[in-house]
């Protein structure tokens, strides 16, 4: 029975490890300067804020963030915005950058190796359960419910899972489960994903969320590190090993998702491509978004820079700036332009006579006068020249910028510098 005392005990004996060192290559130029979990999202957040907020809201106060690739932006964000836990009470958010801590002097070679190289630190914390999380997904989830499910089942490992369209499952680990939720098969990113029996168009995908009994995890990692034929990866190596030698159960996301509307389908997004990133941002600008950022019972925490309020002003000719289905953050100024279904991050300036639709503008973007922007992601610090048109001519867009097959255009400062004057 999940009494308050038992849930509190589960929270106090759990260590959460957030994996935040991946390159995020599918996001193209957006991750040339920063790791994927540090990418801005939803106007004022970073992607990693969702996993960290889930930890805090779930009552988990012992958290480690594993970093490696281009981590400066991420480390600065965590130091400025996530340093409020009290070490006196045994609470912490520790940063575990790659340090070549083990014999052999190599950097993190995979997700499992990243945890293994910090095994001495983990053992010193003495957790009973270890939650391993990907730091690059957008969702709200009560991890304590999943930990309680793990403890009650007696499994060695519990895997968070969600149903996805079968053809989308090529980007995930895919599971087979029996009627008791026991995982009987696991394959990482298959070219031809297996379907759920009786449902040929749907697959059961891993969410990249694992709960391990700590001692069992230690033995798995020590066994894996001595193996020759391994990628040192949880999805490719550790989970298949658990399925064959131990007990793994599947934990459906619906059992622990957090939603202000129980009738809405559970919201979980992998924003690993420009198209997915753009679409997930615009989801938030809809009239009633599936992901409720205004739920005060499950807040998403982040670093709060001190900025003046956003404002819409008339231009010198008296034209009023306006917008609808629009997220606007602090420090933004919109002068005599029309903006719809878009997300404007902090300190964005839009000059007069612009028409902007379905756009995601990251912080400190400046848009010159008389611009037309459609279906774009504008990277941090871009200065769009007066009269620029993006999103109307696919050929011109592809010549100047990074354009996806679905027509989303990513604009970066580097691309703007290469444009003819």
Curated annotation (Swiss-Prot):
The question of whether Isomerase is a record keyword is answered with no
Which top-level group of life is the source organism from?
A: Bacteria
Q: Catalyzes what?
A: alpha-D-glucose 1-phosphate + ATP + H(+) = ADP-alpha-D-glucose + diphosphate
* Class in the EC hierarchy, top level: transferase
The pathway that the record names for this protein is: Glycan biosynthesis; glycogen biosynthesis
Q: Where does alpha-D-glucose 1-phosphate bind?
A: 108, 173, 188-189, 206
Classification via PROSITE patterns: ADP_GLC_PYROPHOSPH_2 (PS00809), ADP_GLC_PYROPHOSPH_3 (PS00810)
Q: Which UniProt keywords apply?
A: ATP-binding, Carbohydrate metabolism, Glycogen biosynthesis, Glycogen metabolism, Nucleotide-binding, Nucleotidyltransferase, Transferase
GO process annotations (BP):
glycogen biosynthetic process
Q: What is its EC number?
A: 2.7.7.27
- MF-aspect GO terms: ATP binding; glucose-1-phosphate adenylyltransferase activity
In the record, the note on similarity to other proteins reads:
Belongs to the bacterial/plant glucose-1-phosphate adenylyltransferase family.
> Which PANTHER family does the UniProt record give?
GLUCOSE-1-PHOSPHATE ADENYLYLTRANSFERASE (PTHR43523:SF2), GLUCOSE-1-PHOSPHATE ADENYLYLTRANSFERASE-RELATED (PTHR43523)
Functional note: Involved in the biosynthesis of ADP-glucose, a building block required for the elongation reactions to produce glycogen. Catalyzes the reaction between ATP and alpha-D-glucose 1-phosphate (G1P) to produce pyrophosphate and ADP-Glc.
According to the record's subunit comment, the protein's assembly and interactions are: Homotetramer.
Protein name listed in UniProt? Glucose-1-phosphate adenylyltransferase
